[in-house]
Amino acid sequence: MKLKPIEVAEILQKEIANINCLSELEEVGQVITVGDGIAQIYGLANVKSGEVVEFKSGVKGLVLNLENDSVGVVIMGDDNQVQQGDNVKRTKEVLEVPVGKALLGRVVDALGNPIDGKGDIASKEYRHIEMKAPGIIERTSVSEPVQTGIKAIDSLIPIGRGQRELIIGDRQTGKTAIAVDTIINQKQAHSLTNESDKIYCIYVAIGQKRSSVAQIVKKLEDAGAMDYTLIVSATASEAAALQFIAPYSACSMGEYFRDNGMHALIIYDDLSKHAVAYRQISLLLRRPPGREAYPGDVFYLHSRLLERAAKMSEEKGSGSLTALPIIETQAGDVSAYIPTNVISITDGQIFLESELFYKGVRPAVNVGISVSRVGSAAQIKAMKQVAGSVKLELAQFRELESFSQFGSDLDPATKAQIDHGKRLVEILKQAQYNPFPVEEQIVSIYVGTKKYLNDVPLQKVKEFEDKMLTEIRLNKKDILESIKNEQCITEETEQKLKAFLENFVKEFVK
């Protein structure tokens, strides 16, 4: 059968119309040099700083340096997969990470990809990792407490929702232990139905050993705390670029809770290693070094991160993001570059001392140097009632203790004050992974400040406290309930507590 020319033309027109031949315009450059996690790229004239680019192998990179004839890119992954001469294309996107409640209970990398082998994360919402910090009008002052469950902190260095409180100390002094205890202590609030009491937790491991991160995950799972916790891990074996962006990614995940009227707590463990990763990147990009070879913008690196922690105003939903950055010092030197930077950015610091740690005072908090600049406004009235004098008494005790080393002839009043100070130090000691509810902390500190321990031998103070709290939980629950509900110690409650303690001390000393 012969086709007429007009029919052939119609068939061709139909076929041409069905061809899906959409041409896409891509901006492509070439890798000039690559090494140490950094690639120099030629040909991407319109690329922007902070933009994501994609290499031929599928590995992503982040543009950090814009030069006259080339672009400096940090490689977010294995740089062995990037070769000289490879093509690189623009994505015209900035870095985004998944956010939302679907991430809770999971361990993710710095880009939000799951690394715990529990399958994909069903998150529908994404956020940029670099977000502008809330302005002054959008914020309100800190007024609600974050209970850490640690007596020495909740009584003397209270933390409020929306605060930035630095945990600083030498290696192996219990910095991470304080952070993990704080996460575990939120379990009680999560057992309640009231959303405003709950605090969702995010732990960011920067430059840590993988074994340490695995240990923390195991501990949180055993304590039942992973249900409301998310872990972002950028371990020491990963690219410096991933260690550099991990805190920003985690902060965006925390901001989801803050901006939706919920409360979140984020722990950066630790920002010393974060600064080292950024120094490595900056030096490889040939940026001019400054003090201790850190780049000039290392202050801005941390300030733009920590300023994102805030307590939002009622119009913005009253949510909050509380930050607990951790800094590791060398031989107790808090006057080094990074420690002084972060101290000046944060609203206070908890200073841990190795000397106290080795003496068996744990948590090894140095009460004299530690301070909370805004937390006292968030402290509940009951805690203020009992802990008001503790800081002064401990400071006087430390002074008298160092003075008493020079002479043994002390008058009875000084001796009594030193004995009282020793018992206060003893009552503030606490085992790891054993956070206390705030009402039990108040009773313990009341016992210490009101000198009920004066007749108890020093080595038996811990035993006294354990037995006393067990007894009060079993037979005097109304005292604890009253403190918890009223948020203060009423006259009636105080009378009951005094009567109970007088009897208990007599029985115990027998």
Swiss-Prot record:
Positions marked as site (Required for activity): 370
EC number in record: 7.1.2.2
PROSITE patterns in alphabetical order: ATPASE_ALPHA_BETA
Keyword Repeat among record annotations: no
Pfam family, one: ATP-synt_ab_N
Subcellular location, record wording: Cell inner membrane
Designated name of the protein: ATP synthase subunit alpha
Lineage: Bacteria, Pseudomonadati, Pseudomonadota, Alphaproteobacteria, Rickettsiales
Gene this protein is translated from: atpA
